Amino acid sequence: MLKKSLIWMFTALFLLMFQTFTPAFASTKHVPQAPSAIYKVDTTKKVVALTFDISWGEKMPGPILNVLNTKNIHKATFFLSGPWIMHHQEIAKQIKSMGYEIGSHGYMHKDFSEQTDNWIREQMGKAEHSFKEVLNLKPTLVRTPNGDFDQRVLRLLNQMGYTVIQWNTDSLDWKNPGVEYMVSRVTTRAVPGDIILMHASDSAKQTAAALPQIIDGLRAKGYQFVTVSELISGVESHTRVQ
């Protein structure tokens, strides 16, 4: 009788354990990761990526390229819009010939989250045509106009073969807040693995003046400069889902 009781007790215990752990096993099913944008990478290495958006103008790219060259910065990433490339082909070619990484900044400067899928595909296709015709390349990195996107946009751009790049430190040069302010803002906020946002469009009138001090300040803190692709290659990217 005792033997039968023990058998029933162990059987009931086994069934209870099975019911308890089965949901846990079920929860381990693979769940596709939501698309996301990259703002920085998690690393202890003192590396940062300088990035420059260009959508219009021809006055500021030259001075900024001169600063980068004078300061021996051979690694930076430029995000160029399609129309700008077509209207300023020689400057675009100069950026490429100097060895800087080039990503897409789309075509028309409108918020992607407010547009249809077909509109986005059409715009990115036009931009790709500009890159191919002038620079003979197809970017794999994209920074959306105004940094605007949502989950739908991220998923669509990922399907088109693009990695969406944002920034962790905004220089605010697009506001022209003053050279000293920009230098202080970037050099105090930058952290290892940072992506730093700046502009080489004509509307950013103070960037070229602030850039030498930003470079010197970051170097004084031990930072080295890499491209975005180098930054995100082989390390865990810090992403955010909008």
Language-model features: locations:
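Catalytic domains of cell-wall/extracellular-matrix polysaccharide-remodeling enzymes
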Residues: 63, 94, 110-197, 201-224, ...
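Short, mixed-charge, low-aromatic patches
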Residues: 19-25, 46-51, 80-86, 137-144, ...
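Active-site beta->alpha N-cap acidic-glycine motif
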Residues: 29-113, 119, 123-130, 139
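Terminal accessory/targeting
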Residues: 1-51, 66-77, 192-242
